[in-house]
């Protein structure tokens, strides 16, 4: 696992070249979508031929996909990989997906768009501090774990309570399915945040050079992606800013600035998750070859 633009995909592909008996499972909430290749930095066809990735291109952009969906899909893929006497190698930056795998799946009510819309309206009217304070009053344990700026999870925690009458914390204690696997956890992180931010900026400009705008135009021309219910795919970093540009809300230069800033903010959130993550083996992404060596050594030592 690691922040965006840290070189996770390159490391995974290199490891696959060295150790054929690993199969890669993508842990990325953006890579699941078809027709969203450039803006998600999805591995290209040549890379996927060398190192196929599970759980890539499994949803249309109009479809929803939850952490619970990922849990079930990843569990199924890991079972199949192990039965083939290979080792599952999970790679990505969607920390909530990793957390779901490690902590287990507990049954939650389905989303309710009206409740979400009402909460978002109230947040715009009174401010997110008040919405977070409401969560503190209802479910202080969850509120303590959810940052004020993590609006999506604040909404979800309140939504769960208003639907079920039970808090997120209470539901976790009622029934919790945990996977039977033992995980070895690695974090691939550059030596400095400035270097990571430089990579992010360079990658965003490279995406524009190879056709990111045209990719989003094709999505923008789909009427089914303009409905209020479609939020997950179009809210992906980069796509949201390009969508605003195509909608005429911002100009091209603003789109670039906002896209880079949003990606940096994503990386910052990912690093915050990782700093709090227990039992991590930290690897320097400035030297991916050495990082790959370290993982290979551990796999051999653990007889994986």
From Swiss-Prot:
Catalytic activity: adenosine(37) in tRNA + dimethylallyl diphosphate = N(6)-dimethylallyladenosine(37) in tRNA + diphosphate
Single biological process term from Gene Ontology: tRNA modification
Binding-site residues, substrate: 4-9
GO molecular function annotations of the record: ATP binding; tRNA dimethylallyltransferase activity
tRNA processing among keywords: yes
Keyword field: ATP-binding, Magnesium, Nucleotide-binding, Transferase, tRNA processing
Ligand binding (ATP): 2-9
Alphabetical list of InterPro entries matching this protein: Dimethylallyltransferase, IPT, P-loop_NTPase
Site features described as Interaction with substrate tRNA, chain residue numbers: 94, 116
Family stated for the protein in its record: Belongs to the IPP transferase family.
Protein name: tRNA dimethylallyltransferase
Gene assigned in the entry: miaA
């Amino acid at each position: 696992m690691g922040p965006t633009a840290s070189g996770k995909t390159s490391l995974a592909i290199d490891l696959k070249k060295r150790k054929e008996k690993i199969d890669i499972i993508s842990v990325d909430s953006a890579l699941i979508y078809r027709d969203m290749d450039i803006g998600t930095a999805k591995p290209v066809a040549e890379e996927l031929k060398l190192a196929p990735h599970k759980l890539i291109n499994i949803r249309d952009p109009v479809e929803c996909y939850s952490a619970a969906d990922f849990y079930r899909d990843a569990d199924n893929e890991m079972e199949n990989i192990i039965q083939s006497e290979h080792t599952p190698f999970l790679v990505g930056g969607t920390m909530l997906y990793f957390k779901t795998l490690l902590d287990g799946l507990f049954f939650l009510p389905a989303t309710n768009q009206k409740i979400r819309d009402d909460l978002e309206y109230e947040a715009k009217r009174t401010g997110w501090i008040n919405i977070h304070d409401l969560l503190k009053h209802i479910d202080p344990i969850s509120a303590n774990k959810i940052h004020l700026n993590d609006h999506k999870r604040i909404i979800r925690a309140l939504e769960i309570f208003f639907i079920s009458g039970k808090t997120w914390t209470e539901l976790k204690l009622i029934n919790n399915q945990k996977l039977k696997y033992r995980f070895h956890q690695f974090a691939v992180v550059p030596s400095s945040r400035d270097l990571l931010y430089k990579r992010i900026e360079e990658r965003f400009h490279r995406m524009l050079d190879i056709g990111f705008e045209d990719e989003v135009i094709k999505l923008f021309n789909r009427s089914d992606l303009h409905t209020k219910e479609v939020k997950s795919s179009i809210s992906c970093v980069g796509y949201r800013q390009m969508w605003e540009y195509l909608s005429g809300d911002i100009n091209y230069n603003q789109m670039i600035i906002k896209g880079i800033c949003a990606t940096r903010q994503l990386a910052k959130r990912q690093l915050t998750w990782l700093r709090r993550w227990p039992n991590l083996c930290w690897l320097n992404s400035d030297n991916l070859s050495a990082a790959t060596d370290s993982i290979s050594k551990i796999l051999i030592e653990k007889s994986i």
